[in-house]
């Protein structure tokens, strides 16, 4: 019941909050202008931008340049961090390959961590590099999505200014909400301090070092921005990051808020005036929510069912291996599904200890990479499936392939197919390399089916810009650092470039009349068709390897 109430409440909050996002996205005046405008203008002066409207090509160039600059600075700081200030625990520099992986990971909103949070970075890099990139990577995804929506919906005839979009989103959305969430987490016991690690003497007389630091400030944007990188190695399974059931709900709600709101925002932009949400967006929301609930049901059923091998020995009950008692199997499964559906990557339990079908659920969500997804890019990926579904359905019934009065032609379909294929190609090719390259497979700590699942999960998490992992994998090696870094880089930027090309191409040949021979996108049967094509296309792509991994493991447990 608590899960049903929580999900219902989050849908309602996201619907209401999308109205505020609508004013932020379209640069409309609001009551908060007096608070934020001066700070925004100061940021624009520092950046040196004149807020001129950009073409799609210029917008992409500035997006890539901005991200490239941040990536270089991050890499340099990580390889010299031990010689900088705010390092009371005397943490060492990262190796070249690990710094490469870490910089790309946080730059692309993945937050895949091949280092221990306690010892891998200093307080300085944790706050200036990691926390800063959590804001900018999230805002970058939002900015390119809003640019795409402005053109697709025809609400404006401009794509916007990249720096204006990113600054407004950080100042008016991320910063206020992060401050509020940080305060709420501190009331639940999450630390926020610059003191060095605590050194205590245990009851047995041994010395123990307890790691803590400025955790609350990172924890808020970590979930709000669908980032996922933990201050501590145990991530949100540790009491300092996630002390109790209330902090658990706060963190889950933070992950869901903005991606859900983006879908409703799309609906408001389609309705032109923003006071209501267009039926097309509601159909998309219901379709994604249906897949979300289906995967959640599978995961919870599998975790509550427990391990059949133990059941045969007379040990009945839920699968509690790798889980925190304060959360139990139910809330652990919910957190797992949310963090992979919304591509956050934080964990409140160890995914490597999930049952075979319990691990299948989050893996499938990342393979789909379309069920709500991360900030902005999740909606962009969904629209690719919408265009693909429309094109196939239209040809099947002899109607004109058209979306929002814009004909879908051969040029757009080439880009759409490329976006669709990049994701599985990166996952499958690099997974195969992990078994072929000498030394790479030595990182696999489990034999047979589960070992394949470990590799597939790691590569899928990198390709989906998620960041969670089956942490039994020994991933801090040259192969895993470089390979996952390349995957994260390609899977982030190539689709974004192609998606903006698709939207610009559609708009340039926009038709201003409604053709009666087109598929209705605001009817329930379109939502059903979308679900069928998502499952069918992804199933044909990934079923063979899933049979070698979690499904094969499930069939062997008796």
Swiss-Prot record:
Give the record's keywords alphabetically.
Cell membrane, Ion transport, Membrane, Potassium, Potassium transport, Transmembrane, Transmembrane helix, Transport
How this chain sits in the membrane, per its record, is: Multi-pass membrane protein
GO cellular component, alphabetical, reads: plasma membrane
Q: Which GO terms describe its molecular function?
A: P-type potassium transmembrane transporter activity; potassium ion binding
Segments spanning the bilayer are 1-21, 66-86, 127-147, 166-186, 245-265, 281-301, 327-347, 354-374, 377-397, 416-436, 482-502, 531-551
What InterPro entries has UniProt attached to this entry? Answer: KdpA
A Pfam family annotated for this chain is KdpA
**Protein location:** Cell membrane
Q: Carries keyword Membrane?
A: yes
Q: What's the subunit arrangement here?
A: The system is composed of three essential subunits: KdpA, KdpB and KdpC.
Family, according to the entry, reads as follows: Belongs to the KdpA family.
Q: What does this protein do?
A: Part of the high-affinity ATP-driven potassium transport (or Kdp) system, which catalyzes the hydrolysis of ATP coupled with the electrogenic transport of potassium into the cytoplasm. This subunit binds the extracellular potassium ions and delivers the ions to the membrane domain of KdpB through an intramembrane tunnel.
Enumerate the PANTHER family for this protein.
POTASSIUM-TRANSPORTING ATPASE A CHAIN, POTASSIUM-TRANSPORTING ATPASE POTASSIUM-BINDING SUBUNIT
This protein is called Potassium-transporting ATPase potassium-binding subunit 1
Give the species this sequence originates from.
Staphylococcus aureus (strain MRSA252)
């Amino acid at each position: 019941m608590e899960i049903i109430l929580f999900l219902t409440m989050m849908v309602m909050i996201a619907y209401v909050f999308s109205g505020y996002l609508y004013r932020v996205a379209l640069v409309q005046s609001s009551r908060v202008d007096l608070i934020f405008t001066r700070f925004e203008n100061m940021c624009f002066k520092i950046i040196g931008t004149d807020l001129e409207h950009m073409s799609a090509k210029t917008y992409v160039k500035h997006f890539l340049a901005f991200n490239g600059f941040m990536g270089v600075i991050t890499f340099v700081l990580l390889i010299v961090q031990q010689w900088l200030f705010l390092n009371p625990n005397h943490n060492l520099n990262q190796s070249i390959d690990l710094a490469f992986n870490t910089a790309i990971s946080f730059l692309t909103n993945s937050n895949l961590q091949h280092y221990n949070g306690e010892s891998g970075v200093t307080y300085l890099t944790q706050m200036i590099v990691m926390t800063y990139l959590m804001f900018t990577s999230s805002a970058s995804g939002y900015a390119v999505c809003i640019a795409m929506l402005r053109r697709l919906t025809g609400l404006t005839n401009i794509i916007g200014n990249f720096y204006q979009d990113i600054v407004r989103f950080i100042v008016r959305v991320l910063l206020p909400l992060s401050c509020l969430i940080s305060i709420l987490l501190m009331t639940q016991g999450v630390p926020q301090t610059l003191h060095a690690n605590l050194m205590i003497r245990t009851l047995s007389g041994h010395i123990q070092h307890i790691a803590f630091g400025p955790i609350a400030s990172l924890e808020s944007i970590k979930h709000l921005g669908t980032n996922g990188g933990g201050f501590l190695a145990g991530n949100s399974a540790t009491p300092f990051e996630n002390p109790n059931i209330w902090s658990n709900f706060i963190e889950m709600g933070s992950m869901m808020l903005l991606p859900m709101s983006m879908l409703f925002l799309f609906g408001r932009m389609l309705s032109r005036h923003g006071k209501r949400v267009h039926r097309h967006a509601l159909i998309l929301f219901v379709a994604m929510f249906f897949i979300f609930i289906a995967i959640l049901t599978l995961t919870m059923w599998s975790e509550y069912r427990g391990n059949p091998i133990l059941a045969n020995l007379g040990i009945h009950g839920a699968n509690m291996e790798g889980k925190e008692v304060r959360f139990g199997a139910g809330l652990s499964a919910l957190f797992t599904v949310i963090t992979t559906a919304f591509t956050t990557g934080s964990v409140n339990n160890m995914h490597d200890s999930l049952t075979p079908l319990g691990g299948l659920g989050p893996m499938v969500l990342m393979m789909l990479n379309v069920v709500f997804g991360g900030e902005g890019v999740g909606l962009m990926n969904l629209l690719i499936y919408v265009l693909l579904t429309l094109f196939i359905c239209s040809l099947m019934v002899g109607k004109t392939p058209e979306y929002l009065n814009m004909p879908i032609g051969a040029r757009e379909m080439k880009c759409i197919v490329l976006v669709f294929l990049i994701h599985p190609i990166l996952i499958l090719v690099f997974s195969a390399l992990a078994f072929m390259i000498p030394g790479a497979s030595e990182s696999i700590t489990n034999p047979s089916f589960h070992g394949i699942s470990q590799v597939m999960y790691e590569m899928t998490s990198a390709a989906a810009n998620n960041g969670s992992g089956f942490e039994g994998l020994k991933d801090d090696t040259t192969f895993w650092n470089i390979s996952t870094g390349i995957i994260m880089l390609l899977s982030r930027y190539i689709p974004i470039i192609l998606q903006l090309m698709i939207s610009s191409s559609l708009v340039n040949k926009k038709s201003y009349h409604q053709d009666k021979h087109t598929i209705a996108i605001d009817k329930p049967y379109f939502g059903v068709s979308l679900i069928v094509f998502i499952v069918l296309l992804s199933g044909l792509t990934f079923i063979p390897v899933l049979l070698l991994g979690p499904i094969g493991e499930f069939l062997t447990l008796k």
